[in-house]
Amino acid sequence: MSALRQVMCRSTASLQLYQANRAAAARWASTATDGGPLDPKTALARPEELEQRNKLSGKITVPTAVNLSPISGVPEEHIRERRVRIHIPPKNAMQSGTDNVNTWQIEFDNRERWENPLMGWASSGDPLSNMNVQFGSPEEAITFCERNGWRWYVDGAAKPKKERVKNYGINFAWNKRTRVSTK
């Protein structure tokens, strides 16, 4: 037999096998109205279970205005009259380069402070005065403040870093005519 004939016989045999499998599957398939096989989880379930599954499979909608202040545990007098400053913290003066300059931070306004008579420490009755929370963007910080019921304001904006001109290094660039040849 030639190679072409062998390939034709194989493809014909595989086509016949495919058609036989398809016919057998059609015989064993469900006689449901959609024509497809039934899911065993739904076929054997009681109507109450199906109704409960349909309720649980739906989407849960949350109102857009979420107020976390009643469940945060912070006293009411610290929530009502607070004002939050959203800002970019200044760059560290140590040798950290530009590390931690791309974050936004919230900071609360100052409340009454007094000097502790025993130790001389600065004291405050405000639990939120020393809390600093960092965020990746001002929008995240604004959302956080609104959910907690605090008034806020954005102080300063993100300033893009200027590209510095490197004057001295340009003198030794390989593609400039300022280099003096030694020969």
Curated annotation (Swiss-Prot):
InterPro entries, per the entry: NADH_UbQ_FeS_4_mit-like, NDUFS4-like_sf
Chain ranges passing through the membrane: none
GO CC annotation terms, alphabetical: mitochondrial inner membrane; respiratory chain complex I
Transit peptide boundaries: 1-28
Organism: Drosophila melanogaster (Fruit fly)
Disulfide links within the chain: none
Keywords of the record: Electron transport, Membrane, Mitochondrion, Mitochondrion inner membrane, Phosphoprotein, Respiratory chain, Transit peptide, Transport, Ubiquinone
Gene name per UniProt: ND-18
Predominant location category: mitochondrion
A Gene Ontology biological process term: mitochondrial electron transport, NADH to ubiquinone
Subcellular location, record wording: Mitochondrion inner membrane
Protein name in UniProt: NADH dehydrogenase [ubiquinone] iron-sulfur protein 4, mitochondrial
Disruption phenotype: RNAi-mediated knockdown results in mitochondrial membrane respiratory chain NADH dehydrogenase (Complex I) deficiency. Mitochondria in the flight muscle shows a wide range of structural abnormalities including dispersed cristae, onion-like swirling membranes, swollen mitochondria, sparse matrix and irregular cristae densities. Eclosion rate is reduced, locomotion and feeding are severely impaired and lifespan shortened. In the brain, there is a pericerebral fat body deficit.
Function: Accessory subunit of the mitochondrial membrane respiratory chain NADH dehydrogenase (Complex I), that is believed not to be involved in catalysis. Complex I functions in the transfer of electrons from NADH to the respiratory chain. The immediate electron acceptor for the enzyme is believed to be ubiquinone.
Modified residues annotated as Phosphoserine in this record: 181
Family: Belongs to the complex I NDUFS4 subunit family.
